[in-house]
Amino acid sequence: MTKIAVLGNGSWGSVLGSMLADNGNDVVLYGNIESVNDEINATHTNSHYMKDWKLNENTRATGDLEDALDGAEVVLFVLPTKAVRIVAKNVREILDKSGAKPLLVTATKGIEPGTKKLISEILTDEIYPNDEDKIVAISGPSHAENVAQKDLTAIACASTNEENAKKVQKLFSNDYVRFYTNDDLVGVEVGGAVKNVIAIAAGILVGQGYGDDAKAALMTRGLAEITRLGVNYFGAKPMTFSGLSGIGDLIVTCTSVNSRNWRAGKQIGEGKSLDYVLKNMGQVVEGATTVKAVHELCEEKNIDMPISEAIYRVLYEGTDVETEIKKMMGRAPKPEIRL
């Protein structure tokens, strides 16, 4: 039995924790909302994030980070991007005292504005300087609501260290979620992060009343943008974006009502403001954060990402959705295949 500390007990953290307990692991969920921790421990439910669902009874929750990390061989980060660095600093302090060197796994999908760093890079900075090998990223078509019901899916687990990727593959795989190893850590992370921006755009199209052709075209051109950023800035492998963490995650996030980013975009397409949407969503919309980092990269490195840039302008510069759509369709002719 492996002890796994799951940092973040929102919907995805709770579902992953329950799944890992299904696999026979000793799972402790860490979160900072006392009422959520109390409910998980008392009834193994998490009604704040997941209605009408129960966690595996061999899970427990705590608000004490040191308790969660004590004896953990694997630490799974399932936090909002904006919280990763501060929690990682606290993790480093505790690990330095204990001397423990657990494997770090990130299920967070985002890019940090300002630093423009991926989650694995933040964890390397704060916990394992110059030791990226001890970090694994998991990403793929996997909404918490579906995995909670043990619907079937497949997810990539990526690391620069093949043995660590295989360890995660063995620990996480079961009869309803299949994990595939991948050696392109940054590529897997870029796909998982930037598809949230494209999903906001897909939701906007639906909110504006556009049909399937428009959505398919958007997703395809969005994938081109994700690939361009991943290859040209982060040094990712182009083929990664044809996999589970690329097109797989993009499809489900751009088409499912379970996607927060898609739902946020739909409301914006219907005329609601970003502030209104974020206030009423009740959960994190990662694409709204990631698009800031993408915008910074586009400006600094002259990367051509017109869909992502249009979403940034709609969300943060107050431009009109209809105007941005007209601008997009009126751009100068370009070849389809280019990096």
UniProtKB/Swiss-Prot annotation:
Pathway recorded for this protein? Membrane lipid metabolism; glycerophospholipid metabolism
Q: Name one GO biological process term.
A: carbohydrate metabolic process
Q: Where in the cell is it found?
A: Cytoplasm
Provide the reaction this enzyme catalyses. sn-glycerol 3-phosphate + NAD(+) = dihydroxyacetone phosphate + NADH + H(+); sn-glycerol 3-phosphate + NADP(+) = dihydroxyacetone phosphate + NADPH + H(+)
Keyword Cytoplasm tagged: yes
Q: Which positions are catalytic residues?
A: K195 (proton acceptor)
E.C. code: 1.1.1.94
- Which residues are noted in the entry as NADPH-binding? S11, W12, K109, A144, R260, V284, E286
GO MF annotations in UniProt: glycerol-3-phosphate dehydrogenase [NAD(P)+] activity; NAD binding
Top EC class per UniProt? oxidoreductase
| Residues that, per the record, bind sn-glycerol 3-phosphate | K109, G140, S142, K195, D249, S259, R260, N261
GO cellular component terms, A-Z: cytosol
State the InterPro entries in the record: 6-PGluconate_DH-like_C_sf, 6PGD_dom2, G3P_DH_NAD-dep, G3P_DH_NAD-dep_C, G3P_DH_NAD-dep_N, NAD(P)-bd_dom_sf
Output the SUPFAM superfamilies linked to this UniProt entry. Answer: 6-phosphogluconate dehydrogenase C-terminal domain-like, NAD(P)-binding Rossmann-fold domains
- What family does the database annotate? Belongs to the NAD-dependent glycerol-3-phosphate dehydrogenase family.
Which HAMAP family does the UniProt record give?
NAD_Glyc3P_dehydrog (MF_00394)
Its annotated function is as follows: Catalyzes the reduction of the glycolytic intermediate dihydroxyacetone phosphate (DHAP) to sn-glycerol 3-phosphate (G3P), the key precursor for phospholipid synthesis.
Q: What is this protein called?
A: Glycerol-3-phosphate dehydrogenase [NAD(P)+]
Origin species:
Lactobacillus acidophilus (strain ATCC 700396 / NCK56 / N2 / NCFM)
- Whichever gene encodes this chain, its name is gpsA
